[in-house]
Amino acid sequence: MAAQKRTLVLVPGSFNHIEFYIPLIEKFTSETGYPLHTVALRTVGKKPGPLPTIYDDAAFIASEVEKLADDGKEMVLMGHSYGGIPISQCMEGLSLAAREKEGKKGGVVRIAYMTALVPAMGENALAGLEGCPTGYTETDEVG
């Protein structure tokens, strides 16, 4: 029996609906044959009630990843842009190794950051941008 292909779990950037990624999703799945699962961030779009936070995004990502892991999926968790922050935040206990220690199947085998913010544990996005130029950047005729 052939080994099961790993599932790519794509977490979008801030202000990005999953629909923006449809061309990427279609090309990736058709050319590689790998399954791809997307996670819509709680912080994207207008919803009633209090504004969701990064922690709401991380908790939702963790719940989606856990469902896939419980189905035996081995995953590469990929965050684009802002998505790098909540995927970093949500990883505790979701790695394949951590789940195997608990007698569970499935889990995250790799984390991938696609032009994403990669904070250290407990660090916020602004700390990760420390030292970068701020404000408006002038451009000339060549960019």
Report the location of each language-model feature.
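Active-site catalytic motif of lipid deacylating hydrolases and related acyltransferases
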Residues: 2-73
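Alpha-helix termini
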Residues: 1, 32, 68-71, 93-105
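Gly/Ala-rich beta-loop-alpha elbow adjacent to hydrolase catalytic centers
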Residues: 79-87
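Flexible "cap/lid" loop of the alpha/beta hydrolase fold
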Residues: 96-143
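Outer-membrane beta-barrel proteins
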Residues: 75-76, 115
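Conserved alpha/beta-hydrolase fold motif
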Residues: 77-78, 111
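Active-site signature of alpha/beta-hydrolase-fold catalytic machinery across serine-
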Residues: 23, 89-93
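Catalytic metal-binding/acid-base residues of hydrolase active sites
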Residues: 42, 83, 117
